A protein has these predicted regions:
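Core dinuclear metal-dependent hydrolase active-site scaffold
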Residues: 1-33, 85-146, 160, 209
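Binuclear metal-ion centers of metallo-dependent hydrolases, dominated by the metallo-beta-lactamase
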Residues: 5-6, 77-93, 166, 170-209
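Divalent metal-coordination and catalytic microenvironments
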Residues: 15, 42, 49, 99, ...
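Redox-cofactor binding/interface segments in oxidoreductases and associated redox assembly factors
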Residues: 23, 39-40, 100-104, 152, ...
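Active-site metal-binding motif and surrounding structural segment of the metallo-beta-lactamase
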Residues: 26-72, 146-151
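Short, acidic/turn-prone active-site loops that include or flank metal/cofactor-
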Residues: 27-28, 44-45, 68-70, 87-91, ...
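Portal/gating segments that form or line small-molecule/metal binding sites
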Residues: 51-107, 119-121, 193
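Metallo-beta-lactamase
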Residues: 122-175, 179-188
Length: 209
């Protein structure tokens, strides 16, 4: 279930199932060109990197992005034919993978305003539902998430802190949780362990970086 999940760095995630899906590829070390699907949560540099898209995409890769990024995609190297634009609440199915865009936004911060309609994703593949939160705080929308594996930001400043992310994990209670978005662009290297310690004996936390 969580063995298929790699956190390559920061919020750059790769999930391998019957499709290979990347989320927000960033600082990718190797050129793999193995992505069946790439999902981008929003257009900040550490989530939408043309250099890193080029390392993982191939001629058949499908790119999923927020509708608000439409004007930013002309240099993505992915044609409109292979691009899906989504807003929070939208659902689609690609090659047998169910993808739902869910809200991702800050409360009381200006970094990720709700009106931008940036997203996280609920992805169901091989009968497992993964939640990739994107850059978000705890809000009324994310409290409703139902998933098997939750990948949540824990680095604070632009997103939830480790303590807040642990609070959210207890609310939505996934079978496993993976901390992301710490130790580089934001947060401290120990934030992942802080998150894990707070959920000890409550939720299975898997440290992937």
């Amino acid at each position: 279930m969580y063995e298929e999940v790699q956190v390559l760095t920061h919020s750059s995630i790769r999930i391998a199932g019957n499709q290979i899906i990347y989320f927000d590829p960033f600082h990718v070390e190797e050129e793999t060109h193995d992505a069946d699907i790439i999902c981008v949560t929003h257009e900040h540099f550490d989530h939408y990197s043309l250099e890193d898209l080029a390392k993982v995409k191939n001629a058949a890769t499908i790119l999923v992005c927020p509708k608000s990024m439409k004007d930013s995609l002309s240099n993505s190297g992915v044609s409109e034919e292979f691009t899906e634009l989504v807003a929070p609440g939208d659902e689609l199915e690609i090659n047998g993978v169910r993808i739902q865009a869910v809200p991702a936004y800050n409360i009381g911060k200006q970094f990720h305003p709700q009106q931008n309609q940036w997203v996280g994703y609920l992805v169901t593949m091989n009968e497992v539902t993964y939640y990739i939160a994107g850059d978000t705080d705890i809000n009324e929308d994310v409290k409703k998430i139902q998933c098997d594996v939750a990948m949540v930001p824990v680095g604070g400043t632009y997103t939830m802190t480790a303590e807040e992310a642990a609070e959210l994990a207890e609310m939505i209670h996934p079978k496993a949780a993976v901390p992301t978005h710490y130790g580089s662009v934001a947060g401290k290297a120990e934030d992942g362990q802080i998150f894990a310690d707070m959920l000890k004996d409550k939720i299975n936390v898997i440290l992937k970086m």
